[in-house]
Amino acid sequence: MGSRASTLLRDEELEEIKKETGFSHSQITRLYSRFTSLDKGENGTLSREDFQRIPELAINPLGDRIINAFFPEGEDQVNFRGFMRTLAHFRPIEDNEKSKDVNGPEPLNSRSNKLHFAFRLYDLDKDEKISRDELLQVLRMMVGVNISDEQLGSIADRTIQEADQDGDSAISFTEFVKVLEKVDVEQKMSIRFLH
């Protein structure tokens, strides 16, 4: 299986993905093997249904929101490069990356990009704000029926009240960042990928 994965991924493609995502050659090869095993249609792309077969996503209350993050607007398939680009947001920041070239593009796994990714999970209508209704939807996904609607409403109201600095009864990206400034987002939004 590993040899099949490496033969289908051209060296030049591997180098481009490595440069773009920061993953090592062996990580890319391993993830390519995983990608091809998920690709039930064997057409070089994954569908939402392919992702829903992943047990960790199937049981995650935000699984559908995470799956949607892999698909550009209006698309229903994702190729390997798009798959890797999204996974790169979850790659831990290595010590040697903290002093990267300031003129180069910001790494996909930077604090800022991780925060943008998390914000988009909440901003369901993509209007650059998290409304009370959007916050309620996400909270409902996370807690299910274990908490009453009244309690959830109270949590949403209190969250917005604490985060909302401009009085528009919503949370902007800037306000979202401010709320999370003391949270170790780099650690909490990281998945360990084997080398």
From Swiss-Prot:
Sequence motif Necessary for association with microtubule and interaction with GAPDH, residues: 2-6
Gene Ontology CC entries for this record: cytoplasm; endoplasmic reticulum; endoplasmic reticulum-Golgi intermediate compartment; extracellular exosome; focal adhesion; Golgi membrane; membrane raft; microtubule cytoskeleton
Source superkingdom: Eukaryota
Disease: Spastic ataxia 9, autosomal recessive: An autosomal recessive disorder characterized by onset of spastic ataxia in the first years of life. Clinical features include motor neuropathy, cerebellar atrophy, spastic paraparesis, intellectual disability, slow ocular saccades, axial hypotonia, distal muscle weakness and atrophy, and pyramidal symptoms, including hyperreflexia and extensor plantar responses.
Sites of N-myristoyl glycine lipidation: 2
PROSITE patterns in the record: EF_HAND_2
InterPro entries linked: Calcineurin_B_homologous, EF-hand-dom_pair, EF_hand_dom
PANTHER family documented for this protein: EG:114D9.1 PROTEIN-RELATED (PTHR46002)
Membrane topology: Lipid-anchor
Region described as Necessary for nuclear export signal: spans on this chain: 143-185
Keywords: Calcium, Cell membrane, Cytoplasm, Cytoskeleton, Disease variant, Endoplasmic reticulum, Lipoprotein, Membrane, Metal-binding, Myristate, Neurodegeneration, Nucleus, Phosphoprotein, Protein kinase inhibitor, Protein transport, Repeat, Transport
GO molecular function, one term: kinase binding
Role: Calcium-binding protein involved in different processes such as regulation of vesicular trafficking, plasma membrane Na(+)/H(+) exchanger and gene transcription. Involved in the constitutive exocytic membrane traffic. Mediates the association between microtubules and membrane-bound organelles of the endoplasmic reticulum and Golgi apparatus and is also required for the targeting and fusion of transcytotic vesicles (TCV) with the plasma membrane. Functions as an integral cofactor in cell pH regulation by controlling plasma membrane-type Na(+)/H(+) exchange activity.
Protein name: Calcineurin B homologous protein 1
Pfam family, one: EF-hand_7
Family per similarity comment: Belongs to the calcineurin regulatory subunit family. CHP subfamily.
Motif (Nuclear export signal 1): 138-147
CDD domains recorded: EFh
Post-translational events: Phosphorylated; decreased phosphorylation is associated with an increase in SLC9A1/NHE1 Na(+)/H(+) exchange activity. Phosphorylation occurs in serum-dependent manner. The phosphorylation state may regulate the binding to SLC9A1/NHE1. Both N-myristoylation and calcium-mediated conformational changes are essential for its function in exocytic traffic. N-myristoylation is required for its association with microtubules and interaction with GAPDH, but not for the constitutive association to membranes.
Localisation: Nucleus; Cytoplasm; Cytoplasm, Cytoskeleton; Endomembrane system
Tissue-specific expression: Ubiquitously expressed. Has been found in fetal eye, lung, liver, muscle, heart, kidney, thymus and spleen.
Domain EF-hand: 26-61, 66-101, 110-145, 151-186
Annotated effect of mutating residue 134 to A: Reduces calcium-binding and SLC9A1-dependent Na(+)/H(+) exchange activity. Does not reduce colocalization and interaction with SLC9A1. Reduces colocalization and interaction with SLC9A1
Record-listed Ca(2+) 2 binding positions: 164, 166, 168, 175
Ranges spanned by the short sequence motif Nuclear export signal 2, renumbered to the chain: 176-185
Assembly, per entry: Monomer. Interacts with STK17B; the interaction occurs in a calcium-independent manner and induces the translocation of CHP1 from the Golgi to the nucleus. Interacts with GAPDH; the interaction is direct, occurs in a N-myristoylation-dependent manner and facilitates the ability of CHP1 to bind microtubules. Interacts with KIF1B (via the C-terminal end of the kinesin-motor domain); the interaction occurs in a calcium-dependent manner.
